UniProtKB/Swiss-Prot annotation:
Belongs to the UPF0146 family. Pfam families: UPF0146. HAMAP family: UPF0146 (MF_00341). InterPro entries: SAM-dependent_MTases_sf, UPF0146. This is UPF0146 protein PYRAB01940. It comes from the Archaea.
Length: 131
């Protein structure tokens, strides 16, 4: 799954990228940071945010169903690894609001919002929306 970081690094200019719903899996965000990106990890779970901060990442608590849109301003891209189907439309809404690409790696079989383009990178399905 670390290949997702390589893919984003190839697609996105250096700058701020946001991982929505980081949970307790920080490897992709940490790899992007190593590659020179300013990574912001977002999660509604305070323990996940503390874990991300303890891993050396910038992290904030946010509810994407009622987002603090200022957190997303200035981003070059927003991505999410295996978000719930309910989260996907809200990730897309945030991306549209701040006019940046969204990348979603769904769980196998989860429906993806219409309008997203499937890209397969090293066998990993990544869905992209861009303004």
């Amino acid at each position: 799954m670390i290949e997702v970081a390589e893919f984003i690094a190839r697609e996105v200019k250096k700058g701020k990228v946001i991982e929505v719903g980081i949970g307790f899996y920080t490897r992709i965000a940490k790899r992007l940071k190593e590659l020179g990106f300013d990574v912001l990890a977002i999660d509604i779970n305070k323990d996940a945010v503390v874990n991300a901060k303890n891993s050396g990442l910038n992290a904030e608590v946010d509810d994407i169903f009622n987002p603090n849109i200022s957190l997303y301003m200035g981003a070059k891209a927003i991505y999410s690894i295996r978000p719930t189907p309910e989260m996907m439309n809200y990730i897309l809404k945030i991306s549209k609001a701040v006019k940046v690409p969204a990348y979603i790696v769904p769980l196998t079989g989860d429906p993806v919002p219409q309008g997203m383009k499937l890209i397969t990178y090293r066998g990993i399905p990544i869905y992209k929306w861009e303004p």
